[in-house]
Amino acid sequence: MDSAKKLSAYRVNAVNSAAPENLVVMLYDGAIRFLGTAIRAFEHEDPLDFNLTIHTNITKTQAIIRELNHALDLENGGELGQNLAGLYLYFDNRLQEANINKEKAIIEEVLERISELRDAWNE
């Protein structure tokens, strides 16, 4: 088995065996990683690479945010669940704007907020 397949199998096993609260942290970690890659794309000189890297990583982050939102238990989550749903919608809208206009500051803003949520979940 080559290294890529081993890493993929390891990740699948880690996700399948993780506690629900750890899955949330893993999703936040993925969003943080993708947003970091999108921010670094602003250093690319090739316009195609610049646009493709930003678009790809923002859409991956949006997919994570939508999954986090979908997983919320709004019936039992109370005010916290409602607040998270509002934040996730805000993040999704801001990232859509960042993707259309290629605005680094918006990506940095969302990255900062998601990092704060990740740190709170990890405590």
Residue ranges of predicted features:
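Alpha-helical segments in soluble extracytoplasmic regions
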Residues: 40-68
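Short, charged, amphipathic alpha-helical segments
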Residues: 52-55, 81-86, 107-112
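Short terminal interaction segments
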Residues: 1-23, 27, 109-123
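Amphipathic, charged alpha-helical scaffolds that flank and support histidine-based chemistry
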Residues: 95-111
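N-terminal first-folded block
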Residues: 17-50
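Short, solvent-exposed, charged loop/turn and helix-capping segments
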Residues: 64-81
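Short, well-ordered alpha-helical segments
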Residues: 31, 77-88
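Generic structural signal for well-ordered, non-transmembrane alpha-helical segments
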Residues: 29-32, 59-62, 66, 89, ...
